[in-house]
């Protein structure tokens, strides 16, 4: 453990092999972004280091670099090529550091200057968006066809039988007995189409037919009776005053 020499005076166990000083994460980002940084205990065991990118063996002083959360440093282009060489269906946990095999992507709740810089540099790459929680691609709006069929819909048989629906041109007209009977009969036909078992359906149908026959007979009888009375009242042969054989004396 040591104390960083920056104004923050953070206690840290990270050690810069090149400058041989303890460094905190703020200094890693601002002043030691290309340095080889490991734990102070590691430096005590082996102080040798090679400031090159292990993926291309190029010097870390050249090109843009990125530091992973394990503190290993690589060229940004090299780590990008390395990740793109993996299968496209690789899970975020499958992207690991080429050196220590620790995960490249930081945990969701991990917050530090190194993590923020790592997210900033990897957010521009397509393979890292899923691991960083960035939407891969915006959802495209669904395109609906605006084609409208000009075919006139055919009238269903049920609609043609249902005469209880009034049309605009005759809905205010007076309804007669025939129209009422036709609408009632149409409703009865539609009712019979319902799929239910009524044990008294045959009896009801017979009673209804009998009632209609009696009603028709009474109606015809009344009509003919009235017509006969009117004809008899206006028949000159039934007028006693028109009969020459009948004499009617006038009162004096």
From Swiss-Prot:
Membrane topology listed for this record: Single-pass membrane protein
Zinc-finger ranges (B box-type): 1-43
GO molecular function: zinc ion binding
Keyword Nucleotide-binding: no
Record-level GO cellular component terms: Golgi apparatus; membrane
Transmembrane segments: 207-227
Keywords carried by this UniProt record: Membrane, Metal-binding, Transmembrane, Transmembrane helix, Zinc, Zinc-finger
Family: Belongs to the ZFPL1 family.
Protein name, as recorded: Zinc finger protein-like 1 homolog
Organism from which the protein derives: Nematostella vectensis
Species classification: Eukaryota, Metazoa, Cnidaria, Anthozoa, Hexacorallia
Gene: zfpl1
